[in-house]
């Protein structure tokens, strides 16, 4: 269990600059030093211990906790401790709809399985060089996004998030589905959207690692109790071996051989956006504010060819474009620009 010394050594008490804060976090702030907010570690310790017990009890009931942390300084800790606890995670990029559109995500996982099987059994060699290259690129992309998430057999019961501000889409999806959300809250966060907040620094690597470690420890302790209650023994999985174990289980239990029809469909799906772009005469999307040649190509890949197409994008489509392709700036400004061009 975490101690006050651990919190101090990891710099959990350092918040953001005083000009960057959320007034709702006032109750967790001890004071300010040199324009930096100092978090009240007495409250942090109390909330930490309470949340530890909540997570431990959830794991003792067999519940699943999804770890989420995609910013650079969080990726390694999220991956390492989620694997250590045998829990799913997202550490590269949160794709809009990962939870709320889970059936579609399962289809993407199935596509990844098919391509991997084709590569293993030599089916890729039967395709043209261009088709094989397209599928290999698709595999690399899907593997990056779905690592840690692909072996999840059902929607998780809880979500543990590093940086609730950055991962706001993930938090919104979890809340929409009624999942409980756990998160360390820095001084710029909104505590109202988190079910189990732990006031603390969510930017420093040592602080992030401490949060992830403690949540993983709580899960491991809870899983041991679950195994004991169900007549089994808790099995410790050595670090680094979780991914291999999960991959083997997924291959044995969920992956079915790729059929010829599935292969043909996959090749057609990958080639379809470029074929459609060639057949359909669209507008010059580079005229849209903030959109260059590369991003215009990404819009075409997603099926948007004209100013009207972009102007009529739904909120969910906008979120997907922002998250999936890391648009520089506010993509809604680009949508507004497209609307002006369409009406001109």
UniProtKB/Swiss-Prot annotation:
Which GO cellular component term is one of those annotated? cytosolic small ribosomal subunit
Q: Which PROSITE patterns match?
A: RIBOSOMAL_S2_1 (PS00962)
**Gene Ontology process terms (BP):** translation
Alphabetized, the UniProt keywords read:
Ribonucleoprotein, Ribosomal protein
Q: Which domain of life is it from?
A: Bacteria
Pfam families named among the record's database cross-references: Ribosomal_S2 (PF00318)
Q: Name one GO molecular function term.
A: structural constituent of ribosome
Which InterPro entries is this protein grouped with? Ribosomal_uS2 (IPR001865), Ribosomal_uS2_bac/mit/plastid (IPR005706), Ribosomal_uS2_CS (IPR018130), Ribosomal_uS2_flav_dom_sf (IPR023591)
Instruction: Check the record and name the NCBIfam families matching this protein.
Output: rpsB_bact
Question: What HAMAP family does UniProt report for this protein, alphabetically?
Answer: Ribosomal_uS2_B
Family membership noted in the UniProt record = Belongs to the universal ribosomal protein uS2 family.
Q: What is this protein called?
A: Small ribosomal subunit protein uS2
